Amino acid sequence: MNYSVLKLPYLEPLVSKTTLKEENGGVTVFPCLRNIGNGTAFKVCITAFNVCIKEATEETYDEVCVAAPFQNEYGHSFVERANEIQAILRMSSFGRMSSFGGRVTLVVQFEDIEENVYEQRFGFSFDVNISNEISSADYTVTSPKLIKQKEINEDSES
């Protein structure tokens, strides 16, 4: 059984540039992936060579970090160290397998100061050759999407 370690060092600076425009013209910056060590946990599922972090299990308002280490029932692990996310993928050696690949998708939910909830997806597609080197890689980032707006209970004065 071979183990390939895929390093994703670009997600942290990518996410930290995320901005949301506010109604009053101001801009809020959400550094979503930071090595801040507070142990914010994510639910994780891994099928074949696909790694997906589905949602944060803790609410954080301006920062989300990936807890390390943890494993799922398949024995795969997803580890974050020093702002570098590593997906450790178990690759079975079936005959002459020349390469394998997959996609890592982080689905991050976060709240702003007014308790509106946003979701943002960060995708990383990759191929690994027989020498365990990344032969091709592609990044995708979606804009933050408002998925839950805070209910306003105050009566407006006329």
Please identify what each model-predicted range represents:
Residues F42-C45, F49-S158:
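An amphipathic alpha-helical interaction surface
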Residues M1-F42, T47:
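Membrane-proximal alpha-helical anchors
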